[in-house]
Amino acid sequence: MIKIGAHMPISKGFDRVPQDTVNIGGNAYQIFPHNARSWSAKLPSDDITTKFKREMKKYGIDWENAFCHSGYLINLASPKEDIWQKSVELLKKEVEICRKLGIRYLNIHPGSHLGAGEKEGTERIVRGLNEVLNSTEDVVILLENVSQKGGNIGYKLDQLKKIRDLVDQKDRVAITYDTCHGFDSGYDITKKEGVEALLNEIETLFGLERLKMIHLNDSKYPLGAAKDRHERIGSGFIGEEGFAVFFSFKEIQKVPWILETPGGNEEHAEDIKKVFEIIEKFDIEVD
């Protein structure tokens, strides 16, 4: 069974997310644990978490298919000490929110070194992750491959491996693969040999069991453009035929697919429908 959903709004409360997910045709989702553009975050009340967990059960969403995404302001690679420290403290709070909600996975962008260099940026990311992981429990941090722009660290998978290799609690660090970011950085998933190479690289660097989520996004720009502009499924340079190749791999089908395509719930419902149309159109076998 395909596990699919979208990044969902929390404006109506955490407890609305499971129902809204099912309403758009999903059985998986991603949310922000707080206002993504704020340094402020607070733990949800016991009443809120009780309602949320009840709705998760009511709508039959598996906890392995529930994800949080860290806020936009966090930058663990920042050479600015005040920003780095605020990032560490906010990430700790996000982990605590996830743990209270019962969500096991928290996705993060590793960060941008802002010109200080990849080596220094990587060291700061590792130091920050160690501080967060050593002061929290249970929640697994997912390192996402990012776009190849600015001082971003993590646009190549071996950069994510360097981070994970240096972290103390490796069992609490796994990865997310974003199809737009990868395409943007030169990973061509529109061809069978490209997907095979990607899967082989993930297996070699991390083990495929460490791939916990796929951000399913088309790309507004061509392969290797380093622009980072998500597009609706089938409407970008990956396209229907490209996604058909990607979807045909059993290893890909085992991982939850989360849409971060332009638009809201209505557009995401259409994109989920489009995914299944591609599967049917290209006669893709699904377990």
UniProtKB/Swiss-Prot annotation:
Residues given in the record as Zn(2+) 3 binding sites: 181, 228, 230
Role of this protein: Endonuclease IV plays a role in DNA repair. It cleaves phosphodiester bonds at apurinic or apyrimidinic (AP) sites, generating a 3'-hydroxyl group and a 5'-terminal sugar phosphate.
Cofactor: Zn(2+)
Catalytic activity: Endonucleolytic cleavage to 5'-phosphooligonucleotide end-products
Bound cofactor: record note: Binds 3 Zn(2+) ions.
EC number: 3.1.21.2
GO BP annotations, alphabetical order: base-excision repair
InterPro entries listed in its UniProt record: AP_endonuc_2, AP_endonuc_F2_Zn_BS, Xyl_isomerase-like_sf, Xyl_isomerase-like_TIM-brl
UniProt: Zn(2+) 1 binding residues: 69, 109, 144
Pfam families (alphabetical): AP_endonuc_2
Ranges annotated as spanning the membrane: none
Similarity field: Belongs to the AP endonuclease 2 family.
Protein name in UniProt: Probable endonuclease 4
Keywords, alphabetical: DNA damage, DNA repair, Endonuclease, Hydrolase, Metal-binding, Nuclease, Zinc
Gene3D superfamilies: Divalent-metal-dependent TIM barrel enzymes
EC main group: hydrolase
